[in-house]
């Protein structure tokens, strides 16, 4: 295979260092010129300023990330066999995890960390939910779907590429059935002994936050005979886990009544005592201040907010938001209580998040001990050359 088969993206002098370290992104500011014409999503070769071959990737002319790398192997073709290999490699790891942990649902493809930039595939039983978030992923849609069908011949595939980031790639939002039957309105899955209902068609992201699986399990270690507050509860995964861990009472708070209704169903589905579960539709910030003013106290608080920051310009505001909400939570905890707090913002580093929690404790006038650290579950791996893949971080904090 020769370079002449593909248009070439030529890097500016000195901008090849990240590629030599096998980082999969090329930003627009590092590009000197294009040699040859390439449509959005098409395969291109990436070379340094002297023409030395570096990688093969997908062209994204509308994005600040001008190209994403498919392969660093000059002899590897980007064809149907390529996508089948990537999916099979990913499935080998997930199948082992599923057998070990008794799972029927997991993230099959985690984008760059599985060698498929812009591709997310979540499995829920026999339903596979597809998100194609880059121009290259969209261009290879047919090959990706074919590879998935070859690996799982009887699967149903549903597209949830209804994510705003596609607009940055010059793509329209997309959602709907791709292969097989429509998923039911609520699909039951199994996670660490829990039965949980997932809304693939209308739920957050692909329907459920699989990345928090291990954190939900860890919650059980802290809640026996405790009063628990579950903030930003969504469909109640943390609440169900807390009840299975023997909590005395759990209050789940969310702004969505639909999500709270599913949370209630999840408690009932697991045969748990519904009298121990309270469901409150409210704004978490406002409710925490109300609880503080009323003198309410809890033994364990789960703080799992949505992403507060989408770009660097929002980071300072997000830091203030994280500090305020964690300060309020710390104020509501009994001495010896535990705060389980998380950030899913990729721009929020673990060190910065830990500093924010420390600052929140100072503002709350309480001492805090960091006793456990969390990250996304093992079906959401982070390849060493792409640290941005570590987006979810969390701490268990003992409040003195």
From Swiss-Prot:
GO molecular function: RNA binding; rRNA (cytosine) methyltransferase activity
Domain PUA, first and last residues per copy: 6-84
Compartment(s) of residence: Cytoplasm
InterPro entries per the UniProt record, alphabetical: PUA, PUA-like_sf, PUA_sf, RLMI, RlmI-like_PUA, SAM-dep_methyl-trfase, SAM-dependent_MTases_sf
Enzyme class: transferase
Keywords, in A-Z order: Cytoplasm, Methyltransferase, RNA-binding, rRNA processing, S-adenosyl-L-methionine, Transferase
GO cellular component, one term: cytoplasm
Catalytic activity: cytidine(1962) in 23S rRNA + S-adenosyl-L-methionine = 5-methylcytidine(1962) in 23S rRNA + S-adenosyl-L-homocysteine + H(+)
Known role: Specifically methylates the cytosine at position 1962 (m5C1962) of 23S rRNA.
Protein family membership: Belongs to the methyltransferase superfamily. RlmI family.
Protein name from the UniProt record: Ribosomal RNA large subunit methyltransferase I
UniProt source species: Klebsiella pneumoniae (strain 342)
Lineage start: Bacteria, Pseudomonadati, Pseudomonadota, Gammaproteobacteria, Enterobacterales
Gene: rlmI
């Amino acid at each position: 295979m020769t370079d002449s088969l593909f248009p070439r993206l030529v890097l500016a002098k000195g901008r090849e260092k990240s590629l030599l370290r096998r980082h999969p992104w090329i930003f627009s500011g590092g590009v000197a010129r294009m040699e040859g014409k390439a449509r959005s999503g098409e395969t291109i070769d990436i070379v340094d300023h002297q023409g030395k071959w570096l990688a093969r990737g997908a062209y994204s002319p509308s994005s600040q990330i001008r190209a994403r790398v498919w392969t660093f192997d000059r002899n590897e073709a980007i064809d149907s066999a390529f996508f089948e290999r990537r999916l099979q490699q990913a499935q080998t790891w997930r199948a082992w995890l599923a057998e070990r942990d008794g799972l029927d649902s997991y993230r099959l493809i985690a984008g760059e960390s599985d060698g498929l930039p812009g591709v997310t595939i979540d499995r829920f039983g026999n339903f596979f939910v597809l998100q194609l978030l880059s121009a290259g992923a969209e261009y290879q849609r047919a090959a990706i779907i074919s590879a998935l069908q070859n690996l799982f011949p009887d699967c149903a595939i549903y597209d949830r590429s209804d994510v705003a980031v596609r607009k940055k790639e010059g793509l329209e939002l997309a959602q709907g059935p791709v292969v097989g039957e429509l998923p039911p309105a609520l699909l039951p899955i199994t996670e660490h002994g829990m039965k949980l209902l997932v809304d693939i068609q209308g739920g957050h992201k692909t329907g459920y936050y699989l990345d928090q699986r291990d954190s939900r399990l860890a919650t059980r270690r802290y809640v026996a005979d405790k009063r628990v507050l579950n903030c930003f509860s969504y469909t109640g995964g943390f609440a169900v886990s807390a009840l299975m861990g023997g909590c005395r009472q759990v209050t789940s708070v969310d702004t969505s009544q639909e999500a709270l209704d599913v949370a209630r169903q999840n408690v009932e589905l697991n045969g748990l005592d519904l009298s121990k579960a309270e469901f409150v539709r409210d704004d978490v910030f406002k409710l925490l201040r109300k609880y503080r003013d009323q003198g309410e106290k809890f033994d364990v608080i789960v703080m799992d907010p949505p992403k507060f920051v989408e770009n660097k310009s929002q980071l300072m505001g997000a830091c203030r938001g994280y500090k305020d909400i964690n300060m309020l939570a710390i104020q509501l905890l009994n001495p010896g209580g535990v705060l389980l707090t998380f950030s899913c913002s990729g721009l929020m580093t673990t060190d910065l998040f830990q500093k924010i929690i420390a600052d929140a404790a100072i503002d709350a006038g309480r001492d805090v001990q960091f006793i456990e650290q969390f990250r996304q579950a093992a079906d959401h791996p982070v390849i060493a050359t792409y640290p941005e893949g570590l987006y979810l971080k969390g701490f268990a904090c003992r409040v003195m």
